[in-house]
């Protein structure tokens, strides 16, 4: 019988309340990595749940406890892009809906780097649209304001070409899939709007890690 997967969660004992730029991401490493090191041998895989090209991902991969046991490590950013590329058709693109305006530049650069510089790779990426909210606003701001901004960002993204998948570009957007779906249906109609894949990076990352652990990749 297959073993059941147990998920445990880690939050740094200190550090930025919200990752709103690259400096925050870098600062969070200094709080997370020392606290994580003592537990690296206890777990089979690791998911960094910050939607960015977070420096903790490559740093964890370099840790001896990770390398010697070939434990898989990924981030929700990387997992969402990989999943999107697998679920869309060859003539479709994927895009990202994120929080503050600064993430437009950061995630565009990070996605280009992740995909590589080939012309074909860039054709698969529709771009980034942002809500103007930060991660904490997604749950602290009035619900109707969050819904309005999310749906506006989704509709702008859908105007950028034949989009087949939309990545939720912040861990704080978990559970907002239906909000994104509503915007897709409003913009494209029931049939086309229902066809769009909405990719939650946390779910994509967990699915990839489970497969990697079971297969030994």
Q: Language-model segments: what does each one mean?
A:
Residues 60-88, 183-206:
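Short, acidic/small-residue loops that bind anionic groups at enzyme active sites
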